[in-house]
Amino acid sequence: MLLTVYCVRRDLSEVTFSLQVDADFELHNFRALCELESGIPAAESQIVYAERPLTDNHRSLASYGLKDGDVVILRQKENADPRPAVQFSNLPRIDFSSIAVPGTSNPQQRQLPRTQAQHSSPGEMASSPQGLDNPALLRDMLLANPHELSLLKERNPPLAEALLSGDLEKFSRVLVEQQQDRARREQERIRLFSADPFDLEAQAKIEEDIRQQNIEENMTIAMEEAPESFGQVAMLYINCRVNGHPVKAFVDSGAQMTIMSQACAERCNIMRLVDRRWAGIAKGVGTQKIIGRVHLAQVQIEGDFLACSFSILEEQPMDMLLGLDMLKRHQCSIDLKKNVLVIGTTGSQTTFLPEGELPECARLAYGTGREDIRPEEIADQELAEAIQKSAEDAERQKP
């Protein structure tokens, strides 16, 4: 069931969050889960439902009458100092807990139970800024809650990996390291906000901190609302033939001219037609040397034979790229809804290739055992395989 928790801290700050729990979830586990979300130690929390405080930690939430969609109130108890305090009747009562002190954690992080402070060193106290001193309990709660576990995998992969490894020591180590890092960042934030407002360096750091927060918030919203934006898409390739040789061509409407690699031109036996007077440098994301230009050749797409010209590049990982000159010449249109390339001058269409049929250099992953191979090496291997196959065909055709 989904419960909404309205939290009121000791300094009267408020926060609201939702928790997905089972009906048989015991109250003490629910307190620990609220501690994880709000930062209020379980020993200092008071949970109220229907104007009635919930006190028996071993009773289930359902036994208190809680059901899906209910709202509970979480209050932080006031500190009870056993030491006799000197009464100053003429002085007003001032709460100093909300004053930020440079170099220390926030007020909620400093309020630790006395029993824990007696057995914890200062380093251990700094490592548990939110009172999460029981990694085993936290691990059990996360494993018992698939929703929280999926959020952990999405937002904190290192901690999720340590959790799923089954090693409690590793999980505790990663958790403590992240808590210490969070405490250091919080101390740095407090130091910056407490610095001289006219200090340009401090203001620049505050500006950078705000910018990073905006980036994180933007990324969190994107992961929740549009997770598909983090995926990768396969590029648009089609099957065609040049001089009778099969070629996988990349369709790129953003390229000005149609290009072909030198290796592909050699396989298609059109290097003899290269006009080297058209040599130059192709500039885009990078620069590559243009060997020359083939002024006219035929490209077969499905059953159509289309006239096309190629600029031959010396070092090009892909075999052929159909640029805007060829696409406009034949009035081609890219139909992403049907996943086809439509040839406007003939009315025919060809389907874009799935990722499994793309050349190695265009796949999102080069495949098992080929992660370290560069696209240039793959092109050389394909050229060697094509030459070997051509030689074998010539041997078989001999009488």
UniProtKB/Swiss-Prot annotation:
A motif (Ubiquitin-binding) lies at residues 376-395. It comes from Mus musculus (Mouse). The active site is at D252. The modification Phosphothreonine is found at T104. This is Protein DDI1 homolog 2. Residues 103-131 have a biased composition (Polar residues). Homodimer. Belongs to the DDI1 family.
